[in-house]
Amino acid sequence: MLESCRNAQERWGGVHQLIDRWLHERQQLVQAFDALSGIQAPAPNAEELQHFCQLLLDYVSAGHFEVYEQLTAEGKAFGDQRGLELAKQIFPRLEAITESALNFNDRCDNGDCREGACLIAELKVLRQQLHERFELEDCLIEVLHNAHSQSGAEGSAVPV
């Protein structure tokens, strides 16, 4: 998961400051996840779990309230029907994964993730969901980046 995060930063870093910041948050989230998922003890470190949950909330919130809106706005500004159609297809799955992440956070806040075995099982599911989410997000960025690059090559002004 960390390797795909690095690849995303290498591919799209510098394209847009908002995306750069978001990809950095993704990397922090993955690192915190890796630290947390390495737990073998019966009880997780409460501070590590709280830190991870905060990063998770920040990341999914930035995606929904900043990045996805920006990607959609740029797709509209560039007249990128392909990108907008892709977003329309992808957003429901991203929303479902966001809901799952928020539920995980709520369970942790309620103390339902204090058991090591329970947490390990939840992290396994969350890992799969985050991996899928990152792939879907990368696909959206790729489409935007391609439209942006093609429009820039044609000499069009870049709306921001």
UniProtKB/Swiss-Prot annotation:
InterPro entries the UniProt entry points to: Rsd/AlgQ_sf, Sigma70_reg_Rsd_AlgQ
Xref: Pfam families: Rsd_AlgQ
Annotated GO biological process: alginic acid biosynthetic process; negative regulation of proteolysis; positive regulation of secondary metabolite biosynthetic process; positive regulation of single-species biofilm formation; regulation of DNA-templated transcription
Keywords of this entry: Activator, Alginate biosynthesis, Transcription, Transcription regulation
Annotated function: The promoter for a critical alginate biosynthetic gene, AlgD, encoding GDP-mannose dehydrogenase, is activated only under conditions reminiscent of the cystic fibrosis lung (i.e. under high osmolarity), and at least two regulatory genes, AlgP and AlgQ, have been implicated in this activation process.
Family annotation (NCBIfam families): PRK11718.1
Family membership: Belongs to the Rsd/AlgQ family.
Identification of the protein by name: Transcriptional regulatory protein AlgQ
Organism per entry: Pseudomonas aeruginosa (strain ATCC 15692 / DSM 22644 / CIP 104116 / JCM 14847 / LMG 12228 / 1C / PRS 101 / PAO1)
